[in-house]
């Protein structure tokens, strides 16, 4: 559905399109490895993540695994383990709230231990983020509510964080106000 206009535009520009629609909520290591296999087998040059936070996180680590083939997903856990530029990475979020399209972080689930772990590296920030609010209009109300609460948590975290500044606090207050007005809290 939502990706069709983008796919058609790319195909009309003679750009190869391969859709990986196997991302699961709370992306797993095996999901990433499947995406990586497709990326390599199809000789792709760029990643467009079109979806919510799980799609963004999965795409980031597919790119990271591509540029760091000898580093397993588990070995990427923590801070600054990738330190290599990803292939062109364009993020198009279909939810509002996770902020994953512009963060240094990805959260991955180890399906064997059922534990989540963060991967943080500056290379995980998308090269481009395309923010189109119209793609969020068809979301179920529950998804809008949950991602809105996610945005609220991010705003509060930014306000109370250890590296907060006057500008950060101002923006956090503005974000809380906008979220409250638009989610009818």
Residue ranges and their predicted role:
Residues 1-46:
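ATP/NTP phosphate-donor binding region
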Residues 22, 79-82, 139, 166:
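A general structural-boundary detector
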Residues 105-185:
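Carboxylate- and glycine-rich phosphate/diphosphate-binding segment that chelates Mg2+/Mn2+
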